[in-house]
């Protein structure tokens, strides 16, 4: 068997400079306010090298200096901060029911947000979405200030092409998301699985201390169920097509048919869809209207026994699946996201008990 040879190239001075600038931006974002001396301590670089890179970041408008920060008296030290207004980013979250798109600054603060229904053929939908984004940008922002577009979608992603390989819940296959949106928006487009994007966002912008928590499991409970994994502070995405969806690990080979074509996937027991369907199997006999997950949770919070029971069963299955992953991955933190967290006081004790049992 022959093995395909890898391509190598020499790393030049410009490559090293770009890498160092990226490292500095990440460090400043994570620990701002931070001094040049602290950057030198963290990176092991000489003070002169640190100052040269920092000055370049300041010149490019990505970082600014200030004196608001910890001081031990005397002349206040100079600290570095991310310039949140240096550029904007477009964020798009394509969901099964609706799609949310937003404009954020360099610090991740959302400036504008809109939502549209996810409907129609993929190409028609993406072009219509681009029209709405264009309208928002033209009315309130300068296009020159935008750096890139980030897109999160449920399903299997080809990161090299920015295409959706397969999204059973969306019923999209081989959809060239990057190609369509780059052509229309004239910006670089990056496509990622929704659970992976959520895990990365939690690490960067959530309440978790990034410096102390280096391994994190994110469980995204939406129409389907996805997982994102951070190990040693880095998103683990596996091969070109992803690490694999733990939401499609089978916990009952004789269970219900999943949208992926297999039976008894974790998703068929613990997703929003599973929770709602469980509720309706009981209430349909009583002639109650079909509810979404938010309405179901509202009923549960008011004491509706059938809604409570449906959520509690979901919590049992969530806890069971998370326990299996925890015992194999040993994350320092587990985060659950999605609409179902509106029922957190109901489901959290059950999930926790299941994990620790």
What are these regions (language model features)?
Residues 1-68, 72-117, 121-145, 207-211, ...:
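ATP-binding/phosphotransfer module of carbohydrate and carboxylate kinases, centering on a glycine-rich
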Residues 92, 148-152, 156-274:
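Phosphate-binding/catalytic loop of phosphoryl-transfer enzymes
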